[in-house]
Amino acid sequence: MKTILIIVIIALVGLAAFGVVYNFAITPPSTSTVTSSATVNGLTLTISGEITRPGTYVINEGATMIDLITAAGGTTSNADYLAWNADFKCVNKGSYYISPIYDNSNTCSLEPIKKANLNADTAETLQAVAGFTKTVANAIVSYRAGAAFTCLEDMKLVSGVGQATYISTRDKVTLRSAEA
């Protein structure tokens, strides 16, 4: 009887230890970095896309896009450096996206995604982007006459560009030309 009781106790302890180890192994690491000084006067920013550790971060006020990218561990090798502005001043509670150079679908892509330049291309070129109508392409050209696009999220400030259009087109546009 004592032998059975000892075996049961050992089995229960083993199961408990396994449960703790298993729970620790499947818990993803935290993606947010919070410093005590940043929580008082910091910006809460979310970054996604071609970033090493996408997530929400609290960083110092006055932070630029490069500060946010650095806090998130940098970009992946597939990040399109022409689609973000390193000097852009982040806005509190802002959500930022780093688009890819190559398509991330299940197919192997050998050619970079053809992208339209929000700050330079004509309405006709912008209209060729799947997701942009003639009206939206003209609205983009009108918008940039008053202010250049400084981040991809600025597209949402254009009349006719909502969240759905932004999401469907953000990988197909850039802020600068490769020659710039």
What is each model feature region?
Residues 1-159, 163-180:
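Ser/Thr/Pro/Gly-biased, low-complexity, turn-/loop-rich segments
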